[in-house]
């Protein structure tokens, strides 16, 4: 579960990590009211889960009331990379002299948490990692002991952070790690940490991703789950209990098991397509659950074809087939072509049940993916 910036900054503030003064607004008048209560200039920032908000027009600076109103009117309701902006964070703009990067995640190759610090903040850190990996200092942490103060200081000094702010940056590094560990997060990131003209340090942005499977022991985040959902599709996925990730492509993908779905995503890409989503219906899925999954994928207007990849173990092929038929029979006209690959338990029975007038059945996964990609390409041409 990824928190919005405003949610992450609330968590940061509670953890003692300095952030600019800010407040959330859901209307133009409310945004202006917040801006007037702060010290100008202010930044008006779209609250959507996309990168590059500034370049896409989702972040604007305002020097006065009129500009704050103009910025809010421009951002609220805009379509930002496929997402409608329905709320903005209004915060005091920071007069900065330098931008840094601080982040914590799990390094799976080392089997340990890793703290990352860089002087090159304010830019895409993935690009820095590719072009100049030496510019990112990495400090691995023994989770049995947690991040020690000397490790935080070493990371900051090794990154070349200016000495007069190094101590404050080290405190932020320590705070970010402690927050990552205490909240069962998969990633906590500040990009950038801004060094102000008065030589203070503040978290000008905030990224926080939580392990959804650990939310049962994180009651403090329970109230944030619904608001953290980006749109109706994510909210619907939460309601149905699906593991769902929306992507930027046009080939919808439904499978039973994370590994199977990931394999299907890779094959869609291999055959020249673009995955529209990750959707795992889980093991033992009954007909109604399959129907819900298909209805959800159809709800994404970017989807031009759908591929089912089902390998029956606990999940029976005949139950999946009934669910597909049930979902498709609700439509006077099928929104997009549907391709199905069934294998495993009761797969033969499932293929017999499937309505050939509604779906295309393929024997192999490769054949199913290629057919789905072809259908998506045809829809694009039309």
Curated annotation (Swiss-Prot):
Tagged with keyword Ligase: yes
GO cellular component, one term: succinate-CoA ligase complex
Pathway recorded for this protein: Carbohydrate metabolism; tricarboxylic acid cycle; succinate from succinyl-CoA (ligase route): step 1/1
Domain ATP-grasp: 9-236
UniProt-listed Enzyme Commission number(s): 6.2.1.5
Swiss-Prot/TrEMBL cofactor(s): Mg(2+)
InterPro entries: ATP-grasp, ATP-grasp_succ-CoA_synth-type, ATP_grasp_subdomain_1, Succ-CoA_synthase_bsu_CS, SUCC_ACL_C, Succ_CoA_ligase-like_bsu, Succinyl-CoA_synth-like
Entry keyword set: ATP-binding, Ligase, Magnesium, Metal-binding, Nucleotide-binding, Tricarboxylic acid cycle
Residues holding Mg(2+): 191, 205
GO MF annotations, alphabetized: ATP binding; magnesium ion binding; succinate-CoA ligase (ADP-forming) activity; succinate-CoA ligase (GDP-forming) activity
One annotated GO biological process: tricarboxylic acid cycle
Cofactor note: Binds 1 Mg(2+) ion per subunit.
Domain of life of the organism encoding this protein: Archaea
Residues at which substrate binds: 256, 313-315
Catalytic activity: succinate + ATP + CoA = succinyl-CoA + ADP + phosphate; GTP + succinate + CoA = succinyl-CoA + GDP + phosphate
Residues binding ATP: 45, 52-54, 91, 94, 99
Role of this protein: Succinyl-CoA synthetase functions in the citric acid cycle (TCA), coupling the hydrolysis of succinyl-CoA to the synthesis of either ATP or GTP and thus represents the only step of substrate-level phosphorylation in the TCA. The beta subunit provides nucleotide specificity of the enzyme and binds the substrate succinate, while the binding sites for coenzyme A and phosphate are found in the alpha subunit.
Family: Belongs to the succinate/malate CoA ligase beta subunit family.
Subunit comment: Heterotetramer of two alpha and two beta subunits.
The protein, known as: Succinate--CoA ligase [ADP-forming] subunit beta
Organism per entry: Halobacterium salinarum (strain ATCC 700922 / JCM 11081 / NRC-1) (Halobacterium halobium)
Taxonomy of the source species: Archaea, Methanobacteriati, Methanobacteriota, Stenosarchaea group, Halobacteria
């Amino acid at each position: 579960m990824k928190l919005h910036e405003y949610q992450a900054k609330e968590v940061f503030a509670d953890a003692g990590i300095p952030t600019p003064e800010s407040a959330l607004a859901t209307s133009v008048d409310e945004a202006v009211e917040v801006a007037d209560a702060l010290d100008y200039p202010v930044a008006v920032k779209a609250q959507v889960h996309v990168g590059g908000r500034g370049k896409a027009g989702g972040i604007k600076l305002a020097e006065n009331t009129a500009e704050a109103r103009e910025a809010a009117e421009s951002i609220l309701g805009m379509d930002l990379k496929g997402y409608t902006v329905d709320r903005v964070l209004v915060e005091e703009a920071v007069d900065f002299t330098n931008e840094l990067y601080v982040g914590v995640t799990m390094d799976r190759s080392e089997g340990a948490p890793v703290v990352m610090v860089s002087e090159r903040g304010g830019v895409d850190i993935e690009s820095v990692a590719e072009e100049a990996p030496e510019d990112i200092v990495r400090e691995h942490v023994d989770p049995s002991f947690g991040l020690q103060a000397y490790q935080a200081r070493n990371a900051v000094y090794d990154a070349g952070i200016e000495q007069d702010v190094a101590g404050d940056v080290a405190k932020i590094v320590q705070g970010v790690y402690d927050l990552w560990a205490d909240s069962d997060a998969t990633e906590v990131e500040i990009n950038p940490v801004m060094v102000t003209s008065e030589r203070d340090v503040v978290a000008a942005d905030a990224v926080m991703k939580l392990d959804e499977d650990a939310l049962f022991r994180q009651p403090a985040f329970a109230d944030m789950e619904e608001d953290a959902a980006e749109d109706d599709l994510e909210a619907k996925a939460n309601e149905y209990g699906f593991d769902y990730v929306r992507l930027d492509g046009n080939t919808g993908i439904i499978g039973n098991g994370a590994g199977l779905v990931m394999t299907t995503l890779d094959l869609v890409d291999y055959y020249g397509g673009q995955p529209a989503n990750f959707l795992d219906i889980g093991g033992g899925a009954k007909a109604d659950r399959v129907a819900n999954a298909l209805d959800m994928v159809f709800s994404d207007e970017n989807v031009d074809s759908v591929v089912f990849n089902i390998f029956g173990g606990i999940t029976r092929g005949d139950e999946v087939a009934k669910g597909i038929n049930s979902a498709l029979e609700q439509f006077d006209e099928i929104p997009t072509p549907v391709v199905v690959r069934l294998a495993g338990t009761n797969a033969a029975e499932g293929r017999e049940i499937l309505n050939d007038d509604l779906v295309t059945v393929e024997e192999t996964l490769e054949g199913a993916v290629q057919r789905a990609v072809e259908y998506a390409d045809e829809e694009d041409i039309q």
